[in-house]
Amino acid sequence: MNIVSWKDANDEVAGGATTRREREVKEDQEETEVRATSGKTVIKKQPTSISSSSSSWMKSKDPRIVRVSRAFGGKDRHSKVCTLRGLRDRRVRLSVPTAIQLYDLQERLGVDQPSKAVDWLLDAAKEEIDELPPLPISPENFSIFNHHQSFLNLGQRPGQDPTQLGFKINGCVQKSTTTSREENDREKGENDVVYTNNHHVGSYGTYHNLEHHHHHHQHLSLQADYHSHQLHSLVPFPSQILVCPMTTSPTTTTIQSLFPSSSSAGSGTMETLDPRQMVSHFQMPLMGNSSSSSSQNISTLYSLLHGSSSNNGGRDIDNRMSSVQFNRTNSTTTANMSRHLGSERCTSRGSDHHM
């Protein structure tokens, strides 16, 4: 008889029996659960490993609260705040009569937290607190206090009335609560603006340099705007300068207006203009003609402008405009003379051709 094979067979049978028993036990447990819940399926969740203390720390969003690990003497339910003397516990243990008086005062004031009653006491003793000597700041705690002083503005100021924050005293709220709260917010905003300005400037030299750079940049921007406006007022548009078509003589040019009417009417005082600049601007609509005609037109305009500037001394631009303007009679006379000269030239050329 083989003992090894018999042992293996018994192990397999024993293993099958144990698996069957485990299944039966599980089925019995499910039946009892279904009967206990009256036919409703219940899903059991595994308990979370996160403790209530850690969840409370996650809910805390105040940056002024400092959490200290157990290695440095901290506790799970205790949090610390940064003061001039270092980190201090937020919770303070009171004696029995002091705690009773504090809770009685809380009930009489009608506030929901004991800390608000303490705030009321601090505000009531404001004058006595101001008479006390200030606390000296140690060098090792100065850096910590300077780091957290931006977060201290989020809380209540030392001389602030609890009634200004909307607390109910004896079950009623005063009418001046809203106005005083708005005034406090406005003053707080002004203080924050002053603090940020002082923080970013740093020193008087830096502030002076920034101010000088700002004025210099502003002066450059104003100068650039003035030059662009001056160029815009000097450059004539095609609708403002009308050039007649060239018939026989290239110098027969009629100018309706040389300057925009809006520039003289809009600006009360206009500076004197250089005739050379005006001639250079008048070359723009005349670039399509020949070089001889453009040079003659430019010379004619320059002579007119130069004569008007020499007679008037360049004092008033209205006189210059009136001297440049042509009347309709003069333009028609010039056109007739040009046509007459053109006809004479044509007849003389015809006679020479016949000869």
From Swiss-Prot:
GO biological process terms, semicolon-separated: leaf development; leaf senescence; regulation of defense response; regulation of DNA-templated transcription
Origin: domain of life: Eukaryota
Location(s), subcellular: Nucleus; Plastid, Chloroplast
Keyword tags: Chloroplast, Developmental protein, DNA-binding, Nucleus, Plastid, Transcription, Transcription regulation
Region Disordered, annotated ranges: 1-57, 329-355
Reported tissue expression: Expressed in cotyledons, particularly in the vascular region, in leaves, buds, flowers and immature siliques, and, to a lower extent, in roots.
Subunit structure and binding partners: Interacts with AHL27 and AHL29. Interacts with SPL. Interacts with KIN10; KIN11 and FLZ3.
Protein name: Transcription factor TCP13
Organism field: Arabidopsis thaliana
Record gene name: TCP13
